[in-house]
């Protein structure tokens, strides 16, 4: 099994969390610059998710649900609650995976292609358009009422894993993130932003 195959699940959620926690408060038409500026104003956020993974060798999609959390500048968490508890935490350049009693800690420096993609996700969260465009081609369609952002990898090494990331939003809410892998498998995550706790 390749290094990319072992990290397939973490890659799916990292891309999804990149935009799910941002809000867009600008009038239509919406530009990439406006979207990035809005994301840069959000130091943290939380959401619930439902995810379906469509894998070629399986007749039915794999479904899961749980919670997502982002804390600027570099911490991302995905806590799957159903069907089985699982936790994935990215903190700095360390990715920690916990499934039952098993815990795996990975150094991103050992996975340069994966690190490049994750840094692009962080750049999105930070609203750093220049850093994002060093790795992806960005295409934004629509306006503030309904918009779609598509990220296409520029680096062939990243493109060997992820074909594209498609994010759709309605007004100031990102409601879906679809990730198409180079091998044809894909995931679709629907997100509901959680209100801040009092």
Spans of model-derived segments:
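Gly/Pro-enriched, hydrophobic low-complexity segments
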Residues: 129-136, 142-198
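Short hydrophobic/aromatic-rich beta-strand segments that constitute the beta-sheet cores
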Residues: 49, 76-79, 95-97, 149-151, ...
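Short, surface-exposed coil-to-beta transition loops
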Residues: 63-65, 84, 91, 159-164
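Amphipathic hydrophobic-ligand
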Residues: 60-66, 185
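Flexible, processing/modification-adjacent segments and terminal tails
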Residues: 28-55, 59-61, 99-154, 161
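Bacterial N-terminal signal peptides
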Residues: 12-22
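An acidic-aromatic
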Residues: 67-119, 187, 193
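Bacterial N-terminal signal peptides that target proteins for export
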Residues: 2-14
């Amino acid at each position: 099994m390749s290094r990319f195959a072992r990290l397939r699940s973490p890659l799916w959620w990292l891309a999804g969390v990149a935009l799910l926690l941002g809000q867009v408060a600008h009038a239509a038409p919406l530009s990439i610059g406006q979207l990035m500026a809005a994301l840069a104003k959000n130091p943290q956020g939380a959401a619930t998710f439902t995810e379906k993974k469509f894998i070629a060798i399986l007749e039915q999609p794999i479904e899961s649900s749980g919670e997502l959390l982002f804390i600027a500048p570099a911490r991302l968490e995905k806590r799957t609650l159903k069907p089985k508890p699982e936790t994935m935490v990215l903190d700095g350049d360390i990715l920690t995976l916990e499934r039952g009693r098993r815990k795996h800690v990975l150094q991103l420096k050992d996975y340069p292609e994966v690190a490049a993609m994750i840094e692009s996700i962080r750049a999105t969260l930070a609203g750093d358009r220049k850093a994002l465009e060093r790795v992806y081609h960005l295409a934004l369609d629509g306006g503030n009422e309904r918009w779609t952002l598509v990220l296409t990898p520029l680096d062939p090494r990243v493109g060997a894993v992820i074909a594209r990331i498609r994010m759709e939003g309605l007004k100031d809410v990102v409601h879906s993130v679809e990730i198409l892998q180079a091998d044809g498998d894909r995931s679709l995550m629907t997100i509901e932003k959680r209100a801040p706790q009092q």
